Design a protein with these regions (language model features):
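Short helix-capping segments at alpha-helix termini
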Residues: 60-61, 174-182, 206-209, 231-236
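Flexible loop/turn connectors
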Residues: 201-322
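Hinge/beta->alpha junction and helix N-cap segments in small-molecule ligand-binding domains
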Residues: 32, 40-48, 67-75, 127-137, ...
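N-terminal helix-turn-helix DNA-binding module of bacterial transcription factors
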Residues: 1-22, 306, 312-322
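Structural signal for hydrophobic
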Residues: 23, 112, 170, 239-240, ...
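Glycine-rich phosphate/diphosphate-binding loops that line cofactor/substrate pockets in enzymes
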Residues: 141-151
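Alpha-helical recognition/docking segments in bacterial nutrient-uptake
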Residues: 22-140, 204-205, 209
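Periplasmic-binding protein-like
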Residues: 25, 87-94, 150-154, 186, ...
């Protein structure tokens, strides 16, 4: 066939096998104001990494990947996804596109993999990272290596199982090690740098002593938090320690370089595709949910050197100047 330069016809292949040879990946739509600039401002770099990993693995396995976006838990999402069932062989849902009832309904009609979900659904297989161990290792490092006793946390979306799991595990660990995580120091953001900046500016406006360290639900949020602190004359890490989650490429070149939790977004997307194809190949067997490991990466924003040598956190809580 190579000598004849034969190229398989995907339509004919689908007719002969009863399959479309197309997988769908649906991710959360960003840019709430609906403008092009709003979409650019709210774009999530980590989502792009996950999509690229899924797309590469799908191609390796002989499938095309159809991308679609949806609003977070919007009532119309189920109807939109049902329309895709005649086009794709299976669906990967990134984060909270559907509630539990919607997932149960959809999964009766087409194989579904929840990517970065809570892992609690009995209706679909979940592929996620070990958020709990990640946040335990981070909180313990801040306390043990830097002497932090006053902690803050900057959340992502309240509807995101990842954000909820990270906040809960961080709180539980801080409580266990005897630290203080007051409610006023849990800030609401939306995964974006702009959201992190806005959350921190709001916190600084209260003119109350700051925690010694803020852990952020993702790297982009941490970048916005650091920007806001710098804008008010506070230095990271001399005045406040800041950490992220994801280890996107930007964090290595940011100043200060960002201490973060490394998770492989590309691997997350690839494994989700592998699990979905396994469900298609063996429709009578449901694969187990998958939890991928993470790694604590120590850099300058928490007071560590690149090699991990730690400096102590500031003992005196900073009061932002007005």
């Amino acid at each position: 066939m190579e000598q004849l330069e034969y190229v398989p016809n995907s339509i004919a292949r689908g007719l002969s096998s009863g399959k479309h040879w197309i997988l769908g990946l649906v991710f959360m739509r960003t840019g709430a104001d609906g403008s092009v600039l709003g979409v650019e401002e709210a774009s999530l770099l980590y989502t792009d990494i996950v999509i690229r990993g899924a797309e590469t693995r799908a191609a390796q396995r002989g499938y095309s990947l159809l991308l679609s976006s949806a609003d977070d838990l919007h009532p119309s999402n189920l109807a939109s996804l049902m329309n895709l069932t005649g086009t794709v062989d299976g669906l990967v849902l990134l984060d909270r596109i559907l509630g539990d009832d919607g997932v149960a309904y959809l999964s009766k009609r087409i194989p579904v993999v929840l990517l970065a979900g809570s892992g609690a659904s009995s209706s679909a297989v979940t592929v996620r990272v070990d958020n709990e161990q990640a946040m335990r290792s981070l909180a313990e490092h801040l306390a043990d290596a830097h002497g932090v006793t006053r902690f803050g946390f900057v959340k992502g979306s309240d509807e995101s199982p990842d954000s909820v799991a990270r906040a809960r595990a961080f709180r539980e660990t801080v409580t266990r090690i005897g630290g203080s995580l007051a409610d006023v120091d849990v800030l609401e953001a939306d995964w974006t740098s702009a959201g992190g900046e806005s959350a921190m500016l709001g916190r600084l406006a209260r003119s109350e002593p700051l925690p010694q360290a803020f852990a952020c639900a993702n790297d982009q949020t941490a970048v916005g938090v650091i920007y806001a602190l710098n804008a008010r004359g506070l230095n990271v890490p001399d005045d406040v320690l800041v950490t992220g989650f994801d280890d996107i490429t930007l964090t290595r070149y940011f100043n200060p370089s960002l201490t973060t939790i490394r998770q492989s977004g590309g691997m997350l997307g690839a494994v989700a595709v592998d699990v979905l194809i396994a469900m298609l190949d063996q429709s009578d067997v449901t694969p187990p949910s998958v939890v991928l490991p993470t790694e604590l990466v120590l850099r300058a924003s928490c007071g560590c050197s690149e090699g991990g040598e730690a400096a102590r956190a500031p003992l005196m809580a900073k009061v932002p100047s007005t």
